[in-house]
């Protein structure tokens, strides 16, 4: 088993956050359950993989710092008429994978 340690997370919150993210990733969100997922392009191709975690009305995406910036930019392309915020935050978290 390996450890995956991150020091940043992309946090998504707001009224439409869950439906917005759920429509763009490969696995359905489930509150309190971290899981691997993929960000899919409109044609269904894998754009990025990451760990996603839903905590109530907030969603946290964990990946390397450079990838988080790319994921945020990708999500912002599809965030029109959607009430949610996307912010990079500092965290200290480690996953056993």
Q: What would you call each of these model-derived segments?
A:
Residues 1-97:
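Basic, glycine/lysine-rich polyanion-binding surfaces/domains
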């Amino acid at each position: 088993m390996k450890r995956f340690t991150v020091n940043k997370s992309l946090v998504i919150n707001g009224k439409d956050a869950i439906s917005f993210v759920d429509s763009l990733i490969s696995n359905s969100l489930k509150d309190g359950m971290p899981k691997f997922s993929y960000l899919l392009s409109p044609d269904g191709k894998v754009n990025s993989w990451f760990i996603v975690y839903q905590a109530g009305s907030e969603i946290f995406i964990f990946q390397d710092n450079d990838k988080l910036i790319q994921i945020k930019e990708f999500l912002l392309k599809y965030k029109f008429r959607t009430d949610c915020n996307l912010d990079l935050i500092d965290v200290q978290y480690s996953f056993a994978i």
